[in-house]
């Protein structure tokens, strides 16, 4: 219903903070529940069983809050984390740009120093919660070097020079609004920088490892719901006086769906454990797990 009516369930999302879901892997010292990536994947998968779009939206908020906690200084953490943990404010992650996708080394949004502010110019694309959320953890270019010139800033929705495009028209996930984020001489305090200048590329890469796991988990949850609905339907629908669940061809299809789902789940859980343990091959496994989970999920849903 939320998807069909394009309803953004902000109250429901905020209520999830009572379960700690506003700060799943934010440290306990910062008010989070400090779970690992495997536990987070289990939570995202379970929520996606009910609504993949809402689960994915909450996962993005968690990525943004985690970046501030993991890499921000004491001042920026004290200023933003309490409201993010309680979800009084909801956060987005702004990396993707027109023409460069999520290639952090190729982004073109610039930030130049002007006194105690950065002045931002550029456009971010496909930003979840764009125009609805309060806080945007944003990757910008402060230097010429491809990867060493990327810096991370916390941008607030109402800062001067920040605007948003119209909501994107999508085939699904319409309970999660998506829009461009536009900077026209936007002024952001230097105090809103997360970590040191030029360190943003490393933060972005670490964030994408967790993001891939969460999107894969959302796909698993949605696919499991579709499989369960399909099994129930085959037991109810009859042909020639027999439930179609008794037909061997139907059983073959359901078995293939279940097998692909369990294979994707096993790889995703393995990748999540590797990210939690900071294994040297964590990025490879998180990318593989996301690819398999989303492709298998689409197949099962179709």
Language-model segments: residues:
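A short core secondary-structure module
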Residues: 117, 121-164
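Short glycine/proline-enriched turns and hinge-like loops at secondary-structure junctions
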Residues: 35-36, 103-105, 129-133, 147-149, ...
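A short, Trp-centered hydrophobic/proline-enriched beta-strand micro-motif
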Residues: 87-95
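Short Gly/Pro-enriched turn/cap motifs at secondary-structure boundaries
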Residues: 57, 99-102, 126-129, 142-144, ...
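Flexible, small-/acidic-enriched active-site or ligand-binding loops
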Residues: 106-108, 158-189
């Amino acid at each position: 219903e939320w998807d069909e009516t394009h309803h953004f369930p902000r109250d429901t999302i905020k209520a999830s903070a009572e379960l700690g879901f506003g700060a799943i892997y934010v440290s306990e010292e910062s008010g989070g529940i400090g779970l690992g990536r495997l536990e987070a994947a289990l939570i995202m998968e379970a929520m996606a069983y009910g609504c993949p779009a809402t689960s994915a939206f909450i996962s993005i908020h968690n990525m943004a809050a985690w970046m501030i906690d993991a890499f921000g200084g004491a001042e920026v953490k004290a200023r933003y984390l309490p409201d993010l943990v309680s979800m009084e404010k909801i956060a987005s992650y702004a990396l993707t740009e027109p023409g460069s996708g999520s290639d952090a080394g190729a982004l073109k949004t610039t930030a130049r120093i002007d006194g105690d502010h950065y002045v931002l110019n550029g456009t971010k694309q496909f930003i979840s919660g764009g125009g609805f959320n309060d806080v945007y953890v944003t990757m910008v270019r402060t230097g010429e070097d491809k990867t060493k010139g990327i810096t991370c800033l916390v941008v607030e929705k109402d800062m001067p020079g920040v605007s948003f495009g119209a909501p994107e028209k999508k085939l699904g996930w319409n309970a999660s609004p998506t829009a461009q984020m536009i900077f026209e001489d936007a002024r952001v305090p230097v105090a809103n920088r997360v970590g040191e200048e030029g360190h943003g590329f490393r933060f972005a890469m670490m964030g994408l490892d967790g993001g891939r796991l969460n999107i894969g988990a959302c796909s698993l949850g949605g696919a499991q719901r579709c499989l369960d609905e399909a099994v129930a339907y085959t037991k109810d629908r009859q042909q020639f006086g027999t439930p179609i669940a008794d037909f061997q061809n139907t059983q073959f299809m359901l078995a293939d769906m279940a097998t692909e789902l369990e294979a994707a789940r096993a790889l995703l859980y393995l990748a999540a454990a590797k990210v939690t343990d900071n294994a040297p091959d964590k990025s490879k496994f998180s990318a593989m797990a996301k690819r398999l989970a989303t492709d298998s999920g689409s197949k099962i849903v179709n």
